[in-house]
Regions:
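Cross-family detector of peptidyl-prolyl cis-trans isomerase
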Residues: 2-312
Length: 312
């Protein structure tokens, strides 16, 4: 046993005191970061500190999800609350619109800060981004006219998931046609569905499962992710289609947040299903568009082919 001399005891005491001093002076982390509260999928409460905004973009994962990791080249379906640091003025709020946004992470469509914040995140994650306005928008970092270059933005993302732009349900064609109440549906891998052999326009709403999925059932209030094509009855070509835009889109499963026929036709369907919705003219009297901007031909019968890819 080594004897504890006064010299050794003094040195030990000095080391302990130094350790305590270092611990007490350790950097607790940046203080100029907003406080964010609230649960995933609900509009967050954001409180800004009374401090200048950080000069550089800063990203923080507030909650790590448990779903698949997002990848570059995918489209990311996410809710987002975006506001100005300086005034708290809201710039974008998908929670109020009741429709998530879709970000194409290919280095061209959104700002680099979005790529850095959303690539490599697990579905179900909540992410905070604080960024100078000139780096917070895309493409090319262009901010809207009402935002000054000296402003800073605060964004809270609730990441629903990442999806391949042409992702769709596995399954072939449906051999309906004029003899039935449904058009024939032909689907080739990675391509928009083609509807043909139209019969008489529907007088009643109907939903038909073309491919039965095996995933969880859709429940009211969930965010669902779909590929879809909408076609006016008897016409060629779609009036609205995710295949012709960015790819999979997210929607809140709530009656007034969806196109006529979607809520009753998709609630209870399983993820992995392909569903044909035939909607008569005037199915929801007075409908013009959703708060998220979804619209359909007024007083016209339509058909939708909807691939249910995910739900959260």
């Amino acid at each position: 046993m080594i004897p504890r001399t006064p010299h050794r005891l003094a040195r030990a005491a000095l080391l302990l005191a130094t350790a305590a001093l270092v611990s007490g002076c350790a950097d607790p982390g940046p203080k100029n970061i907003p406080t964010v509260s609230g649960e995933f999928g609900k509009r967050p409460t954001v409180v800004m500190p009374k401090l200048p905004a950080p000069k550089q973009a800063r990203m923080t994962v507030l909650k790590e999800g448990d779903g698949p990791v997002t990848r570059k080249g995918q489209v990311i379906v996410t809710d987002v609350d975006m506001r100005l640091w300086e005034s708290g003025k809201p710039l974008m709020d998908t929670y109020r619109l009741e429709q998530p946004t879709t970000a194409v992470l290919d280095g061209k469509h959104v700002a680099r800060t979005w790529d850095q914040s959303l690539i490599g995140r697990k579905a179900g994650s909540r992410v905070l981004l604080v960024s100078p306005a000139t780096h917070g928008f895309g493409p090319n970092g262009m901010a809207p006219a009402q935002v000054k270059p000296s402003d800073h933005m605060v964004l809270v993302f609730d990441v629903i998931g990442g999806y391949d732009p042409k992702q769709q349900v596995s399954g072939g064609s449906s051999a309906s046609g004029a003899a039935s109440a449904h058009p024939a549906v032909s689907v080739r891998p990675g391509q928009e569905p083609v509807l043909s052999d139209w019969g008489p326009a529907p007088k009643k709403f109907a939903a038909r499962t073309l491919v039965a999925g095996t995933g969880p059932e859709l429940k009211p209030g969930q965010r669902m992710v779909v590929q879809f094509s909408g076609v006016e009855w008897g016409k060629k070509g779609s009036f609205n289609s995710t295949y012709r835009r960015s790819g999979p889109n997210g929607f809140l499963l709530k009656d007034r947040a969806l196109l006529p026929g979607w809520y009753e036709g998709l609630t209870g369907r399983r993820v992995g299903s392909r569903v044909l919705l035939t909607v008569p003219a005037g199915h929801r009297p007075g409908f013009t568009h959703t708060d998220g901007g979804l619209a359909a031909p007024k007083n016209r019968p339509v058909a939708y082919v909807v691939d249910i890819l995910d739900a959260r």
